[in-house]
Amino acid sequence: MLFRSINMALGSHRPPVTAPKASTGHLLGAAGAVEAIAAVLALKSGLVPAIRNLDDPDDQADVDAVRLTNRGHPHEVALSTSFGFGGHDVSLVLTR
C-alpha cells in the first residue's frame, strides 16, 4: 500500500527509497525521531543509505530501493514516514 501511494503521488519520478529501521530495529517511541534524523543526515551528506538485509525485494514494489551500498544522490527534499501502533502515523517533508 505504501509503495502504491508513493507511485501515485510521484507519477513517473522514482526517487531513491531507504528504510533506516532495517539497521536500527524498532525503537518504539524513538523510531520516528531517529528516522527523521537519518533523513536530515542524508540531505546533508548527499548519500542515501542502503537498506540493510534487503536480499529479496518484492517485485511488485515498483520503487527505487537502495540496496547493497549507499548511493550518492544530491537532493533538496526528503520524505520521512513513520507508522506507529494504533494508527499514529506521520510524514515529514524536509528540505535543505
Model-derived regions, located:
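Conserved "HGTGT" condensation-loop signature of ketosynthase/thiolase-family condensing enzymes
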Residues: M1-R96
